[in-house]
């Protein structure tokens, strides 16, 4: 495990340096934007073993970059700034921030939760690379496509398959019935998981980060850039925006930080054209800390949290079982080129941890140290995806091989191999099936019942 952890760190550094040199977004921006990070691709191919060629792909992907999903943080920041403005208690930087947030509200109007243009572009590019990098896979036989019922997931699927429409003119996106989204929205079908999310330990952990002395001190420093001292005094004591909403200084600053993250769903030209830039309000250390505070929710609810085999990870078992079965069927029948699935970060992250992909399943102690072992921007950026690419040999007596990629990056799995990043399919399948069998999941027909009972 220490070797895998070390190799992941070295690999992360190499990719990070390349991104820093060639990407319009800096490494610091990526590390502070968490699951809101726009998708980044770095070409990293390893030669296929001699005599082998790709013939099938099993895939699960997150929707592309989107507009802010709801107005909550927008409203908090805007209402507090307007209140300060009415009382002439904004600094020049505060006035500029109010102007920017007003612009953000206009950009988001009538688009909450929809894919942004950047998101659409990223999805299209991922599908083009899948087709171009795997010419022996796409023979025009059949592609199965399924999405969650979310409009942005369905649109992501439609954009993705447009690349393949010339080869597959009758290609359609299928959806499980609204009340049976057990493959892609399994997180909605487990009573134990619903209880887990409301767990006092999780709530208290998140609150302890939000109200930590470091959070309060940094929030005060940022507030001084925006408000007069009199207004900061009011904000420290709490300002009531509604019957159930009292906003303190750190709540306001965290809301602004959330908007900073959300801005990354827009392209750099759009940000420049609309004069949107929050960099003057946060230092690098403040960005890193608030990223830790905000992204902790992902780590605890859809990451390894306190137990990398806990209920928040177990619930992805039906999806893993489906991928195992569809892969076996493709190998046996040789009648399908790919299975493509489109869903959410809440789908991809638990699956990655369940598969024990490097960098996804290490438990941090204390929780506040989680960024050293689990980086949301590397695991579940916008348009995140896991691809299983299958290879067969010209010689019938040779084993089927599989390469797993997380966000188009080759990754280590919890098995030994002499041909990294290629693993023998029978060995990998056995490893995962044993894991599922130990949890009592052996038949797709009982998935809903299993999700209802699993603890």
Model-inferred region functions:
Residues 13-19:
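Hydrophobic helical h-region of N-terminal Sec-dependent signal peptides
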Residues 22-23:
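N-terminal signal peptide c-region/cleavage motif recognized by signal peptidases
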Residues 29-144, 148-339, 343-455:
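Signature for phosphate-centric chemistry
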Residues 2-13:
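Bacterial N-terminal signal peptides that target proteins for export
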């Amino acid at each position: 495990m220490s070797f895998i952890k070390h190799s992941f760190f070295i690999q992360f550094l190499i990719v990070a340096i390349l991104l820093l040199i060639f990407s319009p977004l800096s490494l610091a921006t990526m590390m502070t934007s968490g699951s809101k990070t726009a998708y980044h691709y770095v070409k990293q191919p390893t030669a296929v073993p001699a005599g082998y060629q790709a013939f099938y792909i099993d895939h699960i992907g997150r929707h592309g970059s989107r507009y802010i999903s709801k107005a909550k943080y927008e409203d908090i920041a805007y209402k507090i700034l307007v209140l300060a403005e009415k009382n002439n208690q904004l600094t020049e930087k505060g006035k500029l921030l109010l102007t920017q947030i007003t612009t953000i509200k206009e950009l988001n109007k009538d688009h909450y939760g929809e894919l942004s243009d950047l998101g659409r572009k990223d999805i299209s590019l991922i599908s083009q690379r899948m087709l171009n990098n795997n010419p022996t896979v796409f023979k025009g036989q059949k592609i199965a496509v399924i999405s969650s019922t979310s409009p942005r997931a369905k649109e992501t699927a439609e954009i993705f398959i447009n690349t393949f429409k010339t080869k597959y003119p009758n290609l359609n996106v299928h959806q499980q019935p609204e009340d049976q989204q057990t493959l892609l929205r399994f997180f909605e079908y487990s009573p134990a998981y619903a209880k887990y999310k409301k767990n006092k330990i999780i709530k208290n952990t998140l609150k302890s980060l939000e109200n930590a002395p470091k959070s309060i001190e940094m929030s005060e420093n940022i507030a001084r850039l925006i408000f007069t001292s009199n207004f900061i005094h009011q904000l420290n004591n709490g300002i009531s925006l509604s019957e159930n909403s009292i906003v303190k200084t750190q709540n306001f600053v965290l809301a602004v930080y959330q908007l900073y993250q959300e801005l990354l769903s827009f392209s750099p030209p759009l940000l420049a054209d609309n004069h949107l830039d929050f960099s003057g309000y946060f230092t690098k250390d403040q960005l890193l800390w608030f990223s830790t505070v905000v992204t902790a929710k992902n780590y605890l609810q859809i990451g390894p949290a306190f137990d990398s085999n806990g209920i928040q990870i177990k619930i992805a078992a039906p999806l893993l079982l489906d991928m195992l079965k569809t892969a076996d069927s493709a190998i046996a029948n040789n009648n399908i080129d790919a299975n493509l699935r489109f869903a959410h970060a809440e789908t991809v992250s638990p699956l990655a941890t369940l598969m024990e992909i490097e960098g996804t399943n290490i438990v941090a102690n204390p929780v506040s140290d989680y960024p050293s072992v689990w980086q949301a921007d590397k695991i579940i950026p916008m348009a995140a995806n896991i691809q299983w690419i299958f290879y067969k040999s010209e010689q019938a007596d040779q084993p089927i091989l599989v390469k797993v990629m997380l966000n188009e990056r080759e990754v280590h799995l919890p098995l030994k191999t002499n041909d990294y990043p290629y693993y023998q399919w029978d060995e990998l399948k056995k490893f995962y099936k044993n894991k599922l069998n130990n949890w009592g999941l052996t038949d797709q027909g009982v998935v809903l019942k299993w999700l209802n009972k699993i603890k």
